[in-house]
């Protein structure tokens, strides 16, 4: 496919599961466009502050070979920003996880006739939530890597 693939998420504590998801997106399209939750959006969505700022997370994502562009949004979902950008971006597909089958973003993409591909969760990699729990459980001064 000549067109880019759109993904979205928080990407806080970027880990192997995130990287696998980005790589998968790159395999089905020409470049990856990321809609990234802002710090305020994460606070609304998860009732906690992100570990890294949206600017830091965007810089990490932009450094990924497959990522073409990163757009930061303040709402709980990127639909308002996508509404403004989807025509100019002309994505060929939206990739999301099977956890978001009925999401407002999926419905929006379908309304724009953009195919939606569902990826299974990379369960062999820890989630950001489990990584944060592991870090919080460490005795003070202990290295999280072991």
Please identify what each model-predicted range represents:
Residues 1-146:
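Nucleotidyltransferase catalytic core that binds NTPs
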């Amino acid at each position: 496919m000549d067109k880019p693939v759109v993904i979205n998420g928080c990407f806080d504590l970027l880990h192997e599961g995130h990287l696998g998801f980005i790589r998968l997106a790159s395999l089905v399209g020409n470049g990856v466009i990321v809609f990234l939750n802002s710090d305020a959006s994460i606070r609304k969505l998860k009732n906690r502050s992100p570990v890294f700022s949206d600017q830091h997370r965007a810089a990490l994502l932009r450094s990924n070979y497959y990522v073409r562009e990163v757009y930061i949004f303040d709402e709980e979902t990127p639909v308002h920003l996508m509404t403004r950008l989807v025509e100019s971006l002309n994505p060929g597909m939206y990739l999301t996880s099977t956890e978001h089958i009925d999401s407002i973003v999926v419905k929006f993409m379908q309304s724009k006739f953009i195919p939606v591909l569902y990826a299974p969760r990379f369960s062999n990699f820890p989630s950001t939530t489990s990584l944060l729990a592991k870090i919080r459980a460490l005795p003070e001064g202990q290295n999280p890597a072991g």
